[in-house]
């Protein structure tokens, strides 16, 4: 994200098909500290490598058993790029520290993103819920 300004990304997202993503999951018992370290690694890689990521914020439930990640991308290409950059670190997260991974995507994905999800997402397309934009304050 260091090569493109945040203002430029926001403007591009307004004229393209921005995607907002929420990832949900469960932290394995006794694995909270390892989970936090791996989440920090995912954030580090995202900061260093991604060019079309607008948001990538991690949250943990008050009892330390669940997490959510709020994500936003300029477009489908941004989410594809992000997935390629963090693939190995994400695999470590879910093989060692977390499970029950579910994803919600708000926005209209490109065919390339749908193909990627069908082949690589946990549970395939069944682990992802897609919601198309209907109407809002800026529409």
Model-derived regions: residue spans:
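Amphipathic alpha-helical coiled-coil segments
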Residues: 91-95
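Short S/T/G/P-rich N-terminal loop/turn motif that feeds into the first structured element of a domain
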Residues: 1-67, 74-85, 96-139
